[in-house]
Amino acid sequence: MRRLRASSDGERGGIAVIVAFLMVMMLGFAALAIDAAKLYSERAQLQNGSDAAALMMAQKCAKNDTDTNCSTTSPLAADLANKNAIDGLSNVKSIALDKTNRTVTVTAGAKETGASANSVSLFFAGILGIPSAEVNASSSVRWGSPVEGTTIFPLAFSICQVSGMVDGAAQLLQNHSADANADCPLGPAGKTVPGGFAWTVQNSGQCGGLVNLAINQSGSDTGNDGPSNCDAVLNKWASELGAGRPVIVLLPVYDDATGTGSGASYHLTSFVAFSVQGWAFSGSDKLPMVYNASATSGLECKGNCRGIIGKFVKYVSLADGYKLGPVSPNGATVVEMTS
């Protein structure tokens, strides 16, 4: 009997169709992998650029809101966006600046020769009819002076020593109970304010404490041995200063004081930036409670002196954890990313 063989010619066309279909799928996956990687890289560069531009603008506005770079035509914004792109090309798509509410949002878009605005060309996806894709990144920043936050050190300065002294000369500031620093009539309704500084209440187990300018701050009594829980902070300050790096801290300012020690109450008005140079918070001559207390002529703090040496400065901080309000004339401002 003769065997009948089925012809395989009919299957050949089917296999070709399957291969063609698989090739299209492979091209699609290649488009997703390679082009997606390009889009991811481009967006990361744009995000860095928009972050840098927004932070720069907020810092400029915090220092001086009439600065040319505190405007929607900021020339430095475009420069920073370009410098954060690998090819040196980007486009500042928009700048939304609100000086009243102290916010700025910078949106950066891609820029590529031959591609449409804010877009990059795609290689594999182009084969599938998608020649380019738009890539943008936005960054929002706000600025202002602190009105609430946790301080790094439990100390508040008198308005007497701050007024007119931001970016001024270094001072030796002592506890107001020592009457070493001049009082002044800068309190509410011209009330006399004790000069120097005051010790404030610390958070449990911490060196600093929560400060809210809307609420009077209670005082504390550290005795002759300085504040507790502050060894690590003071040792770090000494290490930074010894290495030639500045130590600038944000601390509150009071314009009224009643009582003394742990029974005192202080009316706080603002935060100020203080550049620390030395201190003597106990009668010893060793760290952490004493550092560089006799290095500057005329500002020595020896014997019974309990004080801190340094100067008030205009300073923009990137520290987080503060609630912000309008910019204070006392020079301390904070800039923070919001998105």
Segments (PLM) and residue ranges:
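N-linked glycosylation sequons
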Residues: 66-75, 93-118, 125-339
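Conserved, well-folded catalytic cores of nucleic-acid-processing
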Residues: 56, 60, 83-84, 142, ...
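Alpha-helical assembly-interface signal, strongest on the long, hydrophobic N-terminal helix that forms
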Residues: 1-77, 166-167
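Short, glycine/acidic-rich beta->alpha junctions
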Residues: 38, 119-120
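Sparse, context-dependent recognition of short Cys/His-centered cofactor- or disulfide-binding micro-motifs
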Residues: 17-19, 24, 31, 91, ...
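Short secondary-structure junctions
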Residues: 82-92
